[in-house]
Amino acid sequence: ACEHLQQLTRYKSVHMGNKTIVWNKNSRAVPTLHELGPEKIFDHLFGETPTDVIEQKLKSIGTMRQSLPQQNRAAYVASFEEHERTLATDLEWAKKPVPKVEFDTKLHLTDHHGRGVLDPFQQHLELIRLGIKYRRGQVFVASPPFVDKTDYGVGYGYHALGHRAHLEKSIFGEMLMLEQHFLGCLSDFLTDLKKDQLLDDTIVLFMGAFSSPGGHSREYLPTLLAGGGFDHQGLVECRNPSNPDGPLQHTLSQLYVSILHQMGIDLNEFSGHEGNLDKILT
């Protein structure tokens, strides 16, 4: 989606999730910053970018364009021009003053420092909030990390709990405990966006098992949509009440198309599936 947007922030997209969940237009996985840790993610968003490196890349592309063979030249020119535009925008942003932002880049999984408990998901959401507030990115991706089971007192990680929660009540209770934590983090994030007067201009999409034993379905996945100026409806049941086991009456692909519409991207389908939820959400 970000490739359809005019770049109005330092980066068009920032992927800090811990899974392969983002792909580019060529179906290649977008590398994540997650493994770099919070300090380097913060430096990526709020650190100085050497302009000489970008200028050298621009110069190299210009030199390579001049040396293109006449045969099939047109097939390469468009790609070179796209890279030049991207680098020129990157250079423009690199020359702008970087906002001075205070942020604790250390992980505090237990409150040994008197500064409160901070786990990776809370930290990532706070990085996203600051990134939005100070125009460091337009599209952000994060995901609840592989949790430290000892900190939460559960016997499995979140993903494993989603597979086992239907087996016995105690395992379901563990998944519920984790999801209450994740949704608590999300609630605080939304509250902070609202305080910053950013929520109405920020589309927030959050998915998970939501303590449903029937999780891991790509078609029927509990999904929370917040902000973005939508006409929010509360709970929207996607199954057809007259035929619960039949095709869904509202699909995730339709939701994605409506989100793209709200972002100003005029598309009528997502992944080959047509339709939208505009009549419900806008």
Question: PLM features: residue spans?
Answer:
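Ligand-binding pockets and gating/stacking loops
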Residues: 1-282
